[in-house]
Curated annotation (Swiss-Prot):
InterPro entries: DAZ_dom, DAZ_RRM_vert, Nucleotide-bd_a/b_plait_sf, RBD_domain_sf, RRM_dom. Keywords: Cytoplasm, Developmental protein, Differentiation, Oogenesis, RNA-binding, Spermatogenesis, Translation regulation. GO terms for cellular component: cytoplasm; nucleus; ribosome. Its main location: cytoplasm. One of its GO terms (biological process) is oocyte maturation. It is found in: Cytoplasm. RNA-binding protein, which probably plays a central role in gametogenesis in both males and females. Acts by binding to the 3'-UTR of mRNA, specifically recognizing GUU triplets, and promoting the translation of key transcripts. It comes from the Eukaryota. PANTHER family: BOULE-RELATED, DELETED IN AZOOSPERMIA-LIKE. This is Deleted in azoospermia-like. SMART domains: RRM (SM00360). Residues 1-20 are annotated as: Disordered.
Length: 289
C-alpha cells in the first residue's frame, strides 16, 4: 500500500478525473479524484486520528480523518484526510510531513470506478425429468393412461446484476417428449361401469418340453410348448367356459393317426396319454430283459 501511496503524486486535472498515468515508475489507478481530500500513507501503528488531525490543521479546517483498519481493528498503515474548505491538494502533496521521524506518503485521494456491467455467469436451470406414463394392464375397451403430476419448474439461479432495476424471471415450460415409454409397468384396478360386461383374459404360461423316443420308430424327436396350469383369482367371477389357450398340439406325439383328426387335446388327455406311454415303455424294457 505504501508503493500505491507514492504513486499518487501525479497532477490533478481540471475536471477532477484521473486517467492511468505513470509517476516515478508507478502506475496510478484509474478513478475519480475526490476534491479536498488527501491520501496519507506510511502511518505508524501507534498513531491515532487526533494526532494526524493536528498535523494537517495548518493547511485548513479538517473535516474528517479516517484510518483504514482490518476486521480486528488493527491499522493498515494508511488513511484519508478531508478538509471542510477548498484547499490546494497539490501543495499539500508536495509538502514534507514527518511524524516521529518518519515521512508520510501523500497523494490525491482517488475513488476507483466500479464496473456496473459485471455479472456472474448464469447457472443452467435445473428442472425435473419428464413424467412417466403408466398404462393399465387390464384389457378394457376404454384405454386408461395414468400420468404422474409434474412439479412446477422454477429457475434456481438468475443473472446477478448490479443494475438498479430487476429483470423479469424467465420460466421454461417443460415438454414431455412424444413416445416416452417407462421401464416399468403400473397395475391399477380397472374402473368398471355398472352393467358393463367383464371379460377376463389371462395369458397362458408355456413351458418348453422335449420328447425323444428311440424304441418306437413312429415317434420322432419333437419340441412343443405345454401350458402350465394357472389359477384364477378368487375375487373374479366363475364362468363355465373352455380356455382355448390351454389346448396344444400334443396328440401328434403319441398317436400319429390323429395328427389331422385331433389337432387339439386338453391338458387332462395329455397327462393320460403320457402315463400310458411310460407304461408301454416299461413293459417293453421288461420283455427285452
Amino acid at each position: 500500500m505504501s508503493a500505491n501511496a507514492e504513486a499518487q503524486c501525479g497532477s490533478i486535472s481540471e475536471d477532477n478525473t484521473h486517467s492511468s498515468t505513470t509517476c516515478q515508475g508507478y502506475v496510478l489507478p484509474e478513478g475519480k479524484i475526490m476534491p479536498n481530500t488527501v491520501f496519507v500513507g506510511g502511518i505508524d501503528i501507534r498513531m491515532n486520528e487526533a494526532e494526524i488531525r493536528s498535523y494537517f490543521e495548518q493547511y485548513g479546517t479538517v473535516k474528517e480523518v479516517k484510518i483504514i483498519t482490518d476486521r480486528t481493528g488493527v491499522s493498515k498503515g494508511y488513511g484519508f484526510v478531508s478538509f471542510l474548505d477548498n484547499v490546494d491538494v497539490q501543495k499539500i502533496v508536495e509538502s514534507q510531513i514527518s511524524v516521529h521521524g518518519k515521512r508520510l506518503k501523500l497523494g490525491p485521494a482517488i475513488r476507483k470506478q466500479q464496473n456496473l456491467c459485471s455479472y456472474m455467469q448464469p447457472r443452467p436451470l435445473a428442472f425435473n425429468p419428464p413424467a412417466p406414463q403408466f398404462h393399465s394392464v387390464w384389457t378394457n375397451q376404454n384405454t386408461e393412461t395414468y400420468v404422474q403430476p409434474q412439479a412446477v419448474v422454477s429457475p434456481l439461479t438468475q443473472y446477478v446484476q448490479t443494475y438498479a432495476y430487476s429483470s423479469p424471471a424467465v420460466l421454461i415450460q417443460q415438454q414431455v417428449p412424444v413416445g416416452y415409454q417407462p421401464a416399468y409397468n403400473y397395475q391399477a384396478p380397472p374402473q368398471w361401469v355398472p352393467g358393463e360386461q367383464r371379460n377376463y383374459v389371462m395369458p397362458p404360461v408355456y413351458t418348453s418340453v422335449n420328447y425323444h423316443y428311440s424304441e418306437d420308430p413312429e415317434f420322432i424327436q419333437t419340441e412343443c410348448a405345454v401350458p402350465e396350469p394357472t389359477q384364477m383369482s378368487g375375487n373374479s367371477p366363475q364362468k363355465k367356459s373352455v380356455d382355448r389357450s390351454i389346448q396344444t398340439v400334443v396328440s401328434c406325439l403319441f398317436n400319429p393317426e390323429n395328427r389331422l383328426r385331433n389337432t387339439f387335446v386338453s391338458q387332462e388327455d395329455y397327462f393320460r396319454e403320457r402315463r400310458a406311454h411310460h407304461f408301454r415303455k416299461g413293459r417293453a424294457v421288461l420283455k427285452s430283459v
